[in-house]
């Protein structure tokens, strides 16, 4: 172990055998990330839970009794926070988590293993909720290729699809929150969100790694409304 510039102990992982440098760096980052340790101690499935906690503490998106949709939910960190904040753990609000991957059960969360891009996904979702959603949120990230321009377009395309889904299921006044990355490729996305929502802003919670271009687009005051 070594100490970093703050005086904290820093775990170093040796490269050996078949371990690649990229794997070594990822493992070191995980071992030295305070949010990873905090998530484990709090029983959260991922460090991403703290990102939603920080955003919600500031903007008060999740209120008791709300209906929430978590797109690309696995492993479930955001769904855990939403269930507590809207009261679905106590049967008051409702949280539906959607993912292509299987996800272990979470108290107060209804899970649907499906592709939200399917044409019938909005109808299935509103049937599960018994109506429209108050919040649609997504911490998804597109698979990357290593080619910067291609990756930027993939990321923006995924968010655009998530936003279109949100517009199909949100109630009037609803909220859309999604992960994005700082680039010049999202001008059309932001323009569309500004047409559909009263307020659109970017936020970067402290739990987002500071050396990452990751940030979140937060759109509030949906101007439309889910079809009955």
UniProtKB/Swiss-Prot annotation:
Disulfide bonds: none annotated. S-adenosyl-L-methionine binds at residues 76, 78, 99, 115, 139. Signal peptide: none annotated. The active site is at 179 (proton acceptor). Its main location: cytoplasm. Keywords: Cytoplasm, Methyltransferase, rRNA processing, S-adenosyl-L-methionine, Transferase. Its EC number is 2.1.1.166. GO terms for molecular function: rRNA (uridine-2'-O-)-methyltransferase activity. It catalyses: uridine(2552) in 23S rRNA + S-adenosyl-L-methionine = 2'-O-methyluridine(2552) in 23S rRNA + S-adenosyl-L-homocysteine + H(+). It is found in: Cytoplasm. Transmembrane segments: none annotated. GO terms for cellular component: cytoplasm. Pfam families: FtsJ (PF01728). Specifically methylates the uridine in position 2552 of 23S rRNA at the 2'-O position of the ribose in the fully assembled 50S ribosomal subunit. This is Ribosomal RNA large subunit methyltransferase E. The gene is rlmE.
